[in-house]
């Protein structure tokens, strides 16, 4: 956190709000239910908004992730890879494509913003709480340990409701504030 800066940026990270995670190959009713909440959060957020986009290639099933989760999803260029239309319409910057759960590029971008302008807080929302949200939250926490980080649980969904709740507790243990 940049010392002595009074007008620091607040940042919202919208994690993987893509069709395949909402109502496609890996979609759930819980994921579909948060779309309006995420849309409202973006519309009302006073600060910079970044989107991540899970991005796989046609050879996904040959990758480590594909061997452990043999469900092709978020294949570059497909409808499932696209950010949900009503959310994408609110996007002002290019999404940060990531080949795995967490984005080192995102953490690096945030570190540069903090060094240049200062970051007041970072809030994460999106999918899936128990995979990509926690992965990005912990990467960001490791990169910016003095910046307050929170996850809005009302704008997240996990693979299951149980895994969603479990991972919220894990993030709290790592000093990530959970908004319920």
Residue ranges and their predicted role:
Residues 77-131:
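Internal catalytic-core helix/loop-beta-alpha segment
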Residues 123-127, 146-161:
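A short glycine-rich beta-strand->turn/loop micro-motif centered on a GG-aromatic cluster
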Residues 107, 134-137, 161-165:
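Conserved strand-to-helix beginnings and helix N-cap segments that scaffold or border functional pockets
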Residues 37-42, 134-144:
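Histidine-anchored nucleotide/phosphate-binding helix
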Residues 60-64, 106-109, 135:
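Short, conserved acidic/polar surface loops in the N-terminal third of protein domains
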Residues 54, 101, 154-156:
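Active-site beta-loop-alpha junctions enriched in small/polar residues
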Residues 133-137, 150-153, 168:
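Short amphipathic alpha-helical surface patches that serve as generic macromolecular interface elements
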Residues 2-95, 116, 150, 159, ...:
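Active-site acidic carboxylates
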């Amino acid at each position: 956190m940049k010392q002595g800066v009074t007008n620091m940026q607040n940042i919202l990270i919208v994690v993987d709000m893509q069709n395949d995670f909402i109502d496609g190959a890996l979609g759930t009713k819980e994921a579909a239910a948060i779309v309006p909440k995420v849309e409202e959060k973006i519309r009302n957020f006073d600060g910079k908004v970044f989107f991540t986009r899970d991005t796989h290639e046609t050879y996904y099933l040959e990758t480590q992730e594909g061997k452990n989760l043999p469900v092709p999803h978020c294949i570059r260029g497909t409808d499932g890879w696209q950010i949900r239309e009503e959310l994408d319409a609110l996007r002002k910057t290019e999404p940060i494509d990531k080949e795995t759960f967490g984005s080192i590029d995102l953490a690096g971008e945030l570190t540069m913003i903090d060094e240049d302008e200062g970051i007041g807080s970072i809030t994460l929302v999106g999918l899936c709480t128990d995979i990509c949200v926690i992965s990005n939250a912990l990467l960001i926490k490791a990169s910016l340990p003095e910046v307050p980080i929170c996850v809005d649980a009302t704008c997240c969904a996990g693979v299951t409701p149980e895994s969603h709740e479990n991972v919220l507790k894990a993030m709290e243990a790592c000093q990530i504030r959970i908004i319920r």
